[in-house]
């Protein structure tokens, strides 16, 4: 209390005089002042942690929650654990973009022949070009729907083929598969798994599979979980860069999706399947 009195009245009286009257040592007063202004080691660590976490969270475009941020920071040399990163996010009021409830799309009969389910929900692949998976989703713009077809290599979860169109046709699926074939140097005997949509059952798509010696596989009727890996990618795409945004044209949506696939998802977005690496990093590490 004496030191508090001195602090309040130091503009009126000299420190020396007040210390003499109150019978306290001037050295004690100065030590007390230093202790009040000194930041503890723990406080310094928290401030440093908060600044580093904020920077990483911003770089991730607010997409990473604590586990992925921890992997990102460890790769940069910061030995933070998940609890520390989670606490920092909580204290700063930072929240990754929230997911939405998954609503499976209903199956529509089309009367076309379907392929046998060769995958049977076994999404593991020991190397590249053993198992691919594809699907189509729809994206809303002010101009109308934009349809996106993708092909994913289940080994690394990399998007190796994609195509976008204002119409959901067999050509959309064929174009995505053609890009995958071009990127992967046209491998043979790959299992290519899709749902039973009319685009994948079409004569054009089936002919493309046969022409390149690919093995077609299709999900069970109405079972979206047979193609869970592609559904998971679409979920990440929509949560991380589409939900909450307003797209006035298909062209803007197209550019956004292209940037997400080619610049973000494949190159640097950390994937739990890849041990915290991005699909591109995983492939480079395992093919070196």
UniProtKB/Swiss-Prot annotation:
<dbReference type="GO" id="GO:0006310">
    <property type="term" value="P:DNA recombination"/>
</dbReference>
<keyword id="KW-0233">DNA recombination</keyword>
<dbReference type="InterPro" id="IPR036397">
    <property type="entry name" value="RNaseH_sf"/>
</dbReference>
<dbReference type="InterPro" id="IPR001584">
    <property type="entry name" value="Integrase_cat-core"/>
</dbReference>
<dbReference type="GO" id="GO:0015074">
    <property type="term" value="P:DNA integration"/>
</dbReference>
<dbReference type="InterPro" id="IPR050900">
    <property type="entry name" value="Transposase_IS3/IS150/IS904"/>
</dbReference>
<dbReference type="InterPro" id="IPR025948">
    <property type="entry name" value="HTH-like_dom"/>
</dbReference>
<keyword id="KW-0614">Plasmid</keyword>
<dbReference type="Pfam" id="PF13333">
    <property type="entry name" value="rve_2"/>
</dbReference>
<keyword id="KW-0238">DNA-binding</keyword>
<feature type="domain" description="Integrase catalytic">
    <location>
        <begin position="124"/>
        <end position="287"/>
    </location>
</feature>
<comment type="similarity">
    <text>Belongs to the transposase IS3/IS150/IS904 family.</text>
</comment>
<dbReference type="InterPro" id="IPR048020">
    <property type="entry name" value="Transpos_IS3"/>
</dbReference>
<dbReference type="GO" id="GO:0032196">
    <property type="term" value="P:transposition"/>
</dbReference>
<comment type="function">
    <text>Involved in the transposition of the insertion sequence IS3.</text>
</comment>
<keyword id="KW-0815">Transposition</keyword>
<dbReference type="GO" id="GO:0003677">
    <property type="term" value="F:DNA binding"/>
</dbReference>
<dbReference type="Pfam" id="PF00665">
    <property type="entry name" value="rve"/>
</dbReference>
<dbReference type="InterPro" id="IPR012337">
    <property type="entry name" value="RNaseH-like_sf"/>
</dbReference>
<dbReference type="Pfam" id="PF13276">
    <property type="entry name" value="HTH_21"/>
</dbReference>
<keyword id="KW-0814">Transposable element</keyword>
<protein>
    <recommendedName>
        <fullName>Transposase InsF for insertion sequence IS3fB</fullName>
    </recommendedName>
</protein>
């Amino acid at each position: 209390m004496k030191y508090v009195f001195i602090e309040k009245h130091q503009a009126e009286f000299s420190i020396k005089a007040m210390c003499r009257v109150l019978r306290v040592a001037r050295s004690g007063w100065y030590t007390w002042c230093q202790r009040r202004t000194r930041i503890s080691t723990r406080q310094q660590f928290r401030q440093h942690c908060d600044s580093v976490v904020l920077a990483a969270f911003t770089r991730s475009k607010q997409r990473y929650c604590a586990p992925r941020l921890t992997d990102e920071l460890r790769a940069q040399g910061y030995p933070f654990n998940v609890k520390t990163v989670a606490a920092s996010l909580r204290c700063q009021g930072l929240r990754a973009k929230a997911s939405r409830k998954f609503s499976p799309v209903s199956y529509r009969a089309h009367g076309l022949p379907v392929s046998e389910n060769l995958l049977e929900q076994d999404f593991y692949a020991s190397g590249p070009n053993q198992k691919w998976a594809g699907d189509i989703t729809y994206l809303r713009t002010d101009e109308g729907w934009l349809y996106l077809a993708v092909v994913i290599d289940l080994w690394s979860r990399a998007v190796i083929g994609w195509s976008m169109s204002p119409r959901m046709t067999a050509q959309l699926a064929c174009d995505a598969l053609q890009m995958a074939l071009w990127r992967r140097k046209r491998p043979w005997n790959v299992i290519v798994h899709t749902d039973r949509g009319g685009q994948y059952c079409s004569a054009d798509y089936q002919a493309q599979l046969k022409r390149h010696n690919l093995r077609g596989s299709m999900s069970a009727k109405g079972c979206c979980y047979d193609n869970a890996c592609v559904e998971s990618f679409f979920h990440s795409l929509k949560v991380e860069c589409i939900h909450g945004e307003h797209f006035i044209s298909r062209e803007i949506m197209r550019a956004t999706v292209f940037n997400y696939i080619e610049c973000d998802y494949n190159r640097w977005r950390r994937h739990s399947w890849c041990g915290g690496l991005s699909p591109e990093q995983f492939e480079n590490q395992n093919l070196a």
